[in-house]
């Protein structure tokens, strides 16, 4: 099951989320909106298993990357989102 992965413009281009993802769902792409001139992108969200390691690795106070679990997963885990 794929999950929605959202990258926000508060991304600082540090690559921590990309390196934390065990399934290579994320990659960095050019972007002029931050000092690093790159931003995380999620071209392979169909491979996301919802582990949220990318969220945990994000050093910004804003959680520049968020994984939104699909309905089926949240029900099976007993989570209310």
Swiss-Prot record:
[4Fe-4S] cluster 2 binds at residues 21, 48, 51, 54. Keywords: 4Fe-4S, Electron transport, Iron, Iron-sulfur, Membrane, Metal-binding, Oxidoreductase, Photosynthesis, Photosystem I, Repeat, Thylakoid, Transport. It is found in: Cellular thylakoid membrane. One of its GO terms (cellular component) is photosystem I. GO terms for molecular function: 4 iron, 4 sulfur cluster binding; electron transfer activity; metal ion binding; oxidoreductase activity. Binds 2 [4Fe-4S] clusters. Cluster 2 is most probably the spectroscopically characterized electron acceptor FA and cluster 1 is most probably FB. InterPro entries: 4Fe4S_Fe-S-bd, 4Fe4S_Fe_S_CS, PSI_iron-sulfur_center, PSI_PsaC. [4Fe-4S] cluster 1 binds at residues 11, 14, 17, 58. Residues 2-31, 39-68 form the 4Fe-4S ferredoxin-type domain. GO terms for biological process: photosynthetic electron transport in photosystem I. Its cofactor is [4Fe-4S] cluster. It comes from the Bacteria. It is a peripheral membrane protein. It catalyses: reduced [plastocyanin] + hnu + oxidized [2Fe-2S]-[ferredoxin] = oxidized [plastocyanin] + reduced [2Fe-2S]-[ferredoxin]. Signal peptide: none annotated. Its EC number is 1.97.1.12. Disulfide bonds: none annotated. Apoprotein for the two 4Fe-4S centers FA and FB of photosystem I (PSI); essential for photochemical activity. FB is the terminal electron acceptor of PSI, donating electrons to ferredoxin. The C-terminus interacts with PsaA/B/D and helps assemble the protein into the PSI complex. Required for binding of PsaD and PsaE to PSI. PSI is a plastocyanin/cytochrome c6-ferredoxin oxidoreductase, converting photonic excitation into a charge separation, which transfers an electron from the donor P700 chlorophyll pair to the spectroscopically characterized acceptors A0, A1, FX, FA and FB in turn. The cyanobacterial PSI reaction center is composed of one copy each of PsaA,B,C,D,E,F,I,J,K,L,M and X, and forms trimeric complexes. This is Photosystem I iron-sulfur center. It comes from Prochlorococcus marinus (strain NATL2A).
């Amino acid at each position: 099951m794929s999950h929605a992965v959202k990258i926000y413009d508060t991304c600082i281009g540090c690559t921590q989320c990309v390196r934390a993802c065990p399934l290579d769902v994320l990659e960095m792409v050019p972007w002029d909106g931050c000092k690093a001139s790159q931003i995380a992108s999620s071209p392979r969200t169909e491979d996301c298993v919802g582990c949220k390691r990318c969220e945990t690795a994000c050093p910004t106070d804003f959680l520049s990357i968020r994984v939104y679990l699909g309905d089926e997963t949240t029900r099976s885990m007993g989570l209310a989102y």
